[in-house]
Amino acid sequence: MVKDVISNMNVHMGKSIESLRKEYQKVRTGRATTSLLDDIKIDSYGTLSPLNQVATLAIPEARTITISPWDSKMIAPIEKAIMNSNLGLNPANDGKMIRLVLPPLTEERRKDIVKQLKRDAEEAKVALRNIRRDAIDQLKKLEKDKSISEDELKRAEKDVQDSTNSHVAKVDEVLLHKEKEVMEV
């Protein structure tokens, strides 16, 4: 029973960290990555489709993304969707493909991005603490129901805290890595 609670908690904490990593992939660092465009939806024949389902995305250079639509009629809707995305990118259209050149980030913009990264990391830590609280509540309920002894509860609470500490350290590690990437000129 105790192992189930701790195992379940670890799974949820792992998902929180994975969610943070996915969020960080969407952050612009001055280096081109197709994940910047993951949230862009294109009006494709009456339905909203993700950009990668209507075009081929490529990164020919460090700060350039090319978008080659499978249907040339999709160039205008793709261009419009990118302009409306608040990514601060200006698409250049040559009739067959769209080029996105990522401008270099200013020092001020880098600092703003780092502040946002820290906010996201703090939200992830709050989520981890909430998961820890839920696990401890479940353990206390087991003890109250006499399913586990007080000693087992104390041992399990220590395991929960150790696991939480290790997951918080992972969040800090992910933050530090992304922070370095953003501040790198």
From Swiss-Prot:
Keyword terms, alphabetized: Cytoplasm, Protein biosynthesis
Xref: SUPFAM superfamilies: Ribosome recycling factor, RRF
Function: Responsible for the release of ribosomes from messenger RNA at the termination of protein biosynthesis. May increase the efficiency of translation by recycling ribosomes from one round of translation to another.
GO biological process: cytoplasmic translational termination
Subcellular location: Cytoplasm
Keyword Membrane tagged: no
Descriptive protein name: Ribosome-recycling factor
Similarity comment text for this entry: Belongs to the RRF family.
GO CC annotations, alphabetized: cytosol
Pfam family, one: RRF
HAMAP family in the record: RRF
GO molecular-function term, one example from the UniProt record: ribosomal large subunit binding
Species of origin: Geobacter sp. (strain M21)
Predominant localisation class: cytoplasm
